[in-house]
Amino acid sequence: HPALRGTVVDREDAAPGAQALLATRGLGRRVRFAVGDFFTWVPGGADWYLLKSILHNWDDAAAARILARCAAAAPEGGGLLVIERLRPERLRAGSRDDAVARADLNMLMGLGGRERSLLEYERLLSAAGFRLVSCEPLGHEFAAIKATRMNDADQVRSRETA
C-alpha cells in the first residue's frame, strides 16, 4: 500500500532507533516520528489509529485515558485498530487458555496491567466514544479489534444505555 502514510508516536528516547529502522525499510518518506505521550497527546487528523500491545500494559483507568485521547483526536467515523491478546470470558484449565492466564498474571505483576476479554474491550471502547465493529483472530490468542469513533449523538445514547 504505497499510498499509505503514518505517524509513529513514542517517547523521545525511542526516536533514533525508530527513525533508523524506518529509513532502512524505505519508509522514511511515508512514516514520520513524533515525540509524545499518549496520556496527554495523540496527533489529530488521522483516518486510523493503531494501538498494538499498548492497552494490556495498563489498568482500566489508564487504558480508558489512552482511548479517550484517541477518540478526541479522531474525526467522527475515524477508525481505531487495537491489536491485543484476548482473554476468554471464562478460562478453561488445561487448555490454550493457560497461556493467556499466565500472560494476564505477568501483566498484572510486572506493569499493573491485564489481558482483557472482548467484552471488556468493548466496554472500554464504548466509554471512550468508540463503537466496536469487528474482532478478527490473528493467532496465538491475539486479535485485531476494529472500532469507529461514534458521533456525539451516538455517544450520548451509548452512555444512557450503559
Q: Where are the regions that the model predicts?
A:
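Alpha-helical subdomain
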Residues: 1-162
